[in-house]
């Protein structure tokens, strides 16, 4: 009788444990939500920039595997990004001047409570940059503005821990470039930022948000990149949806072919959020 009772108890505990652990391949939602104002995030949309320029993002990030318990979640996934610089011309023409590619893998872990969560995201990625035919001036048979194509690539590991309370999330980050060309680019990037989704004025249709991201990096000398965005999101606050936003950027260009060029611009855009 005692042996039978132990067997029943063991089976019950096994059932409870298995019910508390959920494993899923290719889940619908990302485990770690993209950091809203961070430039290097999966985006699918476009932004009209001041100065008759346009940024076009065609990017995705997918978790391959996710393991969840009652209040934790671990995931492994992959990233494929392209972000391009276009020039606005008459007759609705937008020649593509420059394009950057990113691909890599990521892992994420978070702990969930009633109103808050904390965790981290780890990424291992490669970026390369190229001029495109829209940068070439057929009239003079040369690249426009005296620019020349140059080799730009970097392989890096990025670590971003974060903490969220209700709609407010703060994060810090460190990126180490273990291989980079050109050599005058520093190997360390320090990052700090936040995003705030104002659920307390959620209309049931959309929610307003603001976000800011700062990166300190070195290209010959230390300099900072500032990225600010504010807008409204339709859909799930912490999931899929569509966003309309104003953004402002100042700092060294995000396009690799212009990596040492300082830029400052405003933009209005739309993005399909993962």
Per-range role (PLM):
Residues 263-274:
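Outer-membrane beta-barrel "beta-signal"
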Residues 20-111, 145:
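Transmembrane beta-barrel domains of Gram-negative outer membranes and organellar outer membranes
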Residues 73-191, 261-262:
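Outer-membrane pore/translocation modules
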Residues 44-46, 78-82, 120-126, 172-176, ...:
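Transmembrane beta-barrel strands of outer-membrane/channel proteins
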Residues 48-55, 70, 114-115, 179-188, ...:
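Solvent-exposed loop/turn segments connecting transmembrane beta-strands
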Residues 21, 26, 65-76, 112-118, ...:
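Short loop/turn motifs that connect adjacent beta-strands in outer-membrane beta-barrel proteins
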Residues 58-60, 105-107, 159, 192-194, ...:
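Membrane-embedded beta-strands of outer-membrane beta-barrel proteins
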Residues 62-64, 109-111, 159-165, 176, ...:
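Residue-level signature of outer-membrane beta-barrel architecture
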């Amino acid at each position: 009788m005692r042996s039978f009772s132990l067997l029943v108890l063991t089976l019950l505990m096994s059932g409870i444990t298995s019910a508390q652990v959920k494993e899923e391949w290719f889940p619908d939602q990302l485990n770690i939500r993209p950091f809203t104002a961070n430039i290097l995030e999966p985006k699918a949309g476009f932004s009209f920039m001041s100065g008759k320029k346009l940024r076009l993002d065609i990017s995705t990030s997918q978790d391959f595997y996710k393991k969840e318990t009652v209040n934790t979640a671990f995931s492994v996934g992959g990233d494929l990004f392209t972000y391009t610089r276009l020039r606005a011309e008459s007759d609705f023409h937008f020649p593509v001047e420059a394009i950057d590619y990113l691909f890599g893998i990521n892992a994420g872990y978070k702990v969930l409570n009633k109103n808050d969560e904390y965790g981290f995201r780890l990424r291992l990625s490669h970026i390369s940059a190229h001029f495109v035919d829209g940068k070439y001036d057929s009239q003079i048979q040369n690249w426009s503005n005296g620019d020349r194509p140059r080799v730009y690539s970097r392989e890096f590991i990025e670590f971003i821990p974060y903490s969220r309370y209700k709609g407010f999330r703060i994060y810090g980050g460190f990126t180490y470039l273990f291989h980079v060309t050109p050599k005058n680019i520093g190997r360390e990037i320090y990052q700090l930022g936040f995003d705030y989704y104002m659920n307390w004025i959620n209309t049931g249709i959309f929610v307003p948000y603001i976000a800011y991201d700062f990166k300190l990096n070195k290209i010959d000398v230390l300099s900072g990149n500032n990225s600010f965005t504010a807008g409204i999101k339709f859909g799930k606050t912490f999931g899929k949806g569509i966003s309309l936003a104003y953004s402002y950027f100042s700092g060294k260009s995000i396009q690799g072919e212009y990596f040492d060029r300082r830029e400052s611009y405003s933009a209005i855009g739309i993005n399909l959020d993962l």
